[in-house]
Amino acid sequence: MSFVVALTGGIASGKTTVANLFHDQFGIDLVDADVIARDVVKPETEGLKAIAAHFGQAILHPDGSLNRAALRERIFAAPNEKAWLNQLLHPMIRQGMRNALTQTTSPYALLIVPLLVENQLQTMADRVLVVDVDEKIQIERTMARDKVSREQAEAILAAQASRAQRLAIADDVLKNDAENQKLLPQITLLHQKYLAMSRQNL
């Protein structure tokens, strides 16, 4: 398995942009926790079968896929149901990430985990890279991107780990405050650093 760098950051911090630059500029393999989280609840998976057995068939669309809106509604006001769902899916997602990481072939791999701090997944990586953005900018970007109100954007931010909590576990920090932030020079330096570290890790 490659040397693993976990990439995290709050909502609208620019994680996807950063990950794509690592991939497009330097050919670094990406493993995205959000993609794996969707994969483990696809039709015919054990994850979706367990969800349907627990919540009933009304949680599915007519085509057999998960009705995410219905599921969100069911767990929103029921912390015990949310806890049940997390207990079911988190081990599946962790295993999916491990499996995907074993398939990577670049000198190091980027493991993209938005909720790294919240789910205490930093042990899955050799290094943690945090994309850091001022919270006011996060709120503005979230409002513009997701077409939500300021109150909704603030609520999303409040539900995530704080900026300080993320920075506390960071080995490396990539600043992405400005609209025209020069990301590539920062990423190039980090890439060179991770290449050197991955060679030492052999």
From Swiss-Prot:
Q: Does the keyword Kinase apply?
A: yes
* Keyword terms, alphabetized: ATP-binding, Coenzyme A biosynthesis, Cytoplasm, Kinase, Nucleotide-binding, Transferase
Q: Which PROSITE patterns match?
A: DPCK (PS51219)
Note the HAMAP family from the entry: Dephospho_CoA_kinase (MF_00376)
Task: Give the record's pathway.
Answer: Cofactor biosynthesis; coenzyme A biosynthesis; CoA from (R)-pantothenate: step 5/5
Name the catalysed reactions: 3'-dephospho-CoA + ATP = ADP + CoA + H(+)
Which PANTHER family does the record associate with it? BIFUNCTIONAL COENZYME A SYNTHASE-RELATED (PTHR10695:SF46), DEPHOSPHO-COA KINASE-RELATED (PTHR10695)
Task: Give me the gene this protein comes from.
Answer: coaE
Keyword check for Transport, yes or no: no
Class of the enzyme per the UniProt entry, highest EC level: transferase
Q: Which GO terms describe its cellular component?
A: cytoplasm
Localization per Swiss-Prot or TrEMBL? Cytoplasm
Record InterPro entries: Depp_CoAkinase, P-loop_NTPase
EC number(s) given by UniProt: 2.7.1.24
Which superkingdom heads the taxonomic lineage of this protein's source?
Bacteria
Function, as annotated, reads: Catalyzes the phosphorylation of the 3'-hydroxyl group of dephosphocoenzyme A to form coenzyme A.
Q: What is this protein called?
A: Dephospho-CoA kinase
Coiled-coil residue spans: none
Span of domain DPCK: 4-201
GO molecular function terms noted in the UniProt entry: ATP binding; dephospho-CoA kinase activity
- Can you supply a Gene Ontology BP term from the record? coenzyme A biosynthetic process
List the NCBIfam families. dephospho-CoA kinase
